[in-house]
Amino acid sequence: MWVAERVVGERRMREIQRFARNAKLTVVCLLLTVVVLRGTVGAGKFGTPQQDLIELRHRFISHPHRALAEHHDALSRGGGSSSSSGRAAQRDDEPDPPPRTLRDPPYTLGPKISDWDEQRAAWHRRHPETPPFVNDVKPRVLLVTGSSPKPCENPVGDHYLLKSIKNKMDYCRVHGLEIFYNMALLDAEMAGFWAKLPLLRALLLAHPEIEFLWWMDSDAMFSDMAFELPWERYGPYNLIMHGWDEMVYDDKNWIGLNTGSFLLRNCQWSLDFLDTWAPMGPKGPVRIEAGKVLTKYLKDRPVFEADDQSAMVYILATEREKWGDKVYLENGYYLHGYWGILVDRYEEMLENYHPGLGDHRWPLVTHFVGCKPCGKFGDYPVERCLKQMERAFNFGDNQILQMYGFTHKSLGSRKVKRIRNETSNPLDVKDELGLLHPAFKAMKTTST
């Protein structure tokens, strides 16, 4: 030591010793910091088995859908511990059968039924407690909608599907309608536009008590909660759609009607019409070739595979004598209302008009055609679609909330505000829109 002191000097040696002591202290503090952080924050992929177990448990509890997806992937790769579970997963993932070719027999929805009116009448004689009409003019109605069995490709799409079904449930509750939500593809051949046809036929046959099915697309919402359909107008008709006679029968325009919201009576005529409508629907060569026929025949139709709406126009225009007398193309109110011409006018409607009109002044339905909130790609910017869908939902929701004394702060806000003070005599509060106990609500009739 004294040799070192003589070489570097006594003062310099003391500085070196002080630095060494400080370095030791720094290393000790660093080790203590690592130990503390490892025990509290977590060691990540270099952690202890106990900490790793905690992190795994948190991960799978917080993200159960991810755990299920990983489990499903493992089974599909043959990694499942149970051979029966593996076989079940493989069966579920089996590819669809080859598409129908042009040489195959035409597609059918099921066995031909020719006496449905007689079968249904006999059923009603056996079950008088469920008549097809709830009063002299109002039929028993089942509103039908649905979505894909798979999650939306756009994560926010599932949230807007929830808003859409909530909106429909509100309207059905106020108007005494039943509702059916479908998430099953009943026939793989009829995917896409055409998936509704097998479902409608199945519901007609399973529910003879229902007089009308009301199909509504998942991207359509009720905007007028007070509007009751003019049922007395539809006595002689079996199919009611939004459209114009001159555009369908004279111009043969492919947008002369809309199949996103329509009514179909439960009768033999409807089964026959579905049988005529369906053969253009099977995916593959049949749908592609049918699309060429529709594009050639219908005015302004772009080139793409056959869709249910174009096929409807084609059938009515080419076979008007057979079907036209039982089809009512409604344009007195918005059974379907194109969102692009409605959503920017909501504030004007609120200022100048009131619910219960159903037409351009206060539309019954706002239909977001082309938005595809559940998919990754639509015909319009996704930000605009989602913003306007939020406004449309709140526009209808305000009519429900007002019954309970609330409203959204604005059409673009999820937050609500109180619009009247609470009272000790709540039954004396006036129901301004008449939606709490509407006279048009379907009441269950009793047989005498």
From Swiss-Prot:
Disruption phenotype: Root hair phenotype, characterized by short root hairs with bubble-like extrusions at the tip. It is a single-pass type II membrane protein. GO terms for biological process: root hair elongation; xyloglucan biosynthetic process. It catalyses: Transfers an alpha-D-xylosyl residue from UDP-D-xylose to a glucose residue in xyloglucan, forming an alpha-(1->6)-D-xylosyl-D-glucose linkage. GO terms for molecular function: hexosyltransferase activity; UDP-xylosyltransferase activity; xyloglucan 6-xylosyltransferase activity. Probable xyloglucan xylosyltransferase involved in the biosynthesis of xyloglucan in roots. Residues 1-19 are cytoplasmic. Pfam families: Glyco_transf_34 (PF05637). Gene3D superfamilies: Spore Coat Polysaccharide Biosynthesis Protein SpsA, Chain A (3.90.550.10). Residues 43-448 are lumenal. Expressed in root tips, leaves, inflorescences and panicles. It is found in: Golgi apparatus membrane. This is Probable xyloglucan 6-xylosyltransferase 1. Glycans are attached at residue 421. It comes from Oryza sativa subsp. japonica. Belongs to the glycosyltransferase 34 family.
